[in-house]
UniProtKB/Swiss-Prot annotation:
Localization per Swiss-Prot or TrEMBL: Cell projection, Cilium
Organism encoding this protein: Mus musculus
Keyword Transmembrane helix: no
Protein name: Intraflagellar transport protein 22 homolog
Gene: Ift22
Function: Small GTPase-like component of the intraflagellar transport (IFT) complex B.
Key words of the record: Cell projection, Cilium, GTP-binding, Nucleotide-binding, Phosphoprotein
Molecular function terms, GO-annotated: GTP binding
């Protein structure tokens, strides 16, 4: 059984924990409490299997605190990560600049492929959820961008997240198959 480690990172108060709970069907949190360090959610998704073999997959979703005081922990969090989801609040202009740093640290410096990274512009309840195009600078403008509004259209982000998980698992499965072929030949 394949097991994938996915990091949820991004600025403080961007909605990482709320989104993580929703996508893993964990408990709801009604009041804001900043994540201290990291919170690990383990889950399976019946819609995601390994390369059409029907083999189930397990996931670890690492909900990482957005405060820079945890920066010294980041190398440990990044170890063996298969994917990174950068969550930001599209209604806070400074978040657009901050996500460049998150991308640099968690994707570029870890030599993760861009296809293993997804941006989520999370719109909080009552924010209006303006879905206009965001002015993302290169290389962020090449990444998959999903708008999340759990009040108005919760299933859109769930469907996109499942597609993302499938792409991670397919990549892991192909890599494992290549390694097995090298051993055989």
């Amino acid at each position: 059984m394949l097991k994938a480690k996915i990091l949820f990172v991004g600025p403080c108060e961007s909605g990482k924990t709320v989104l993580a709970n929703f996508l893993t069907e964990s408990s709801d949190i009604t009041e804001y409490n900043p994540t201290q360090g990291v919170r690990i959610l383990e889950f399976e998704n019946p819609h995601v299997t390994s390369n059409n073999k029907g083999t189930g997959c397990e996931f670890e979703l690492w909900d990482c605190g957005g405060d820079s005081k945890f920066e010294s922990c980041w190398p440990a969090l990044m170890k063996d990560a298969h994917g990174v989801v950068i969550v930001f609040n599209a209604d806070i202009p400074s978040h657009l600049k901050e996500i460049e740093m998150w991308y640099s640290c968690f994707v570029q410096q870890q030599f993760l492929q861009d296809s293993h990274c997804m941006l989520v512009a999370h719109h909080k309840p009552g924010s209006g959820g303006e879905r206009g195009s965001l002015a993302l600078s290169p290389p962020l403008n090449k990444l998959k961008l999903v708008h999340s509004n759990l009040e108005e259209d919760p299933e859109e982000v769930r469907v996109e997240f499942i597609k993302y998980l499938k792409s991670i698992i397919n990549s892991m499965s192909e890599s494992r198959d290549r390694e097995e072929m090298l051993i055989i030949t």
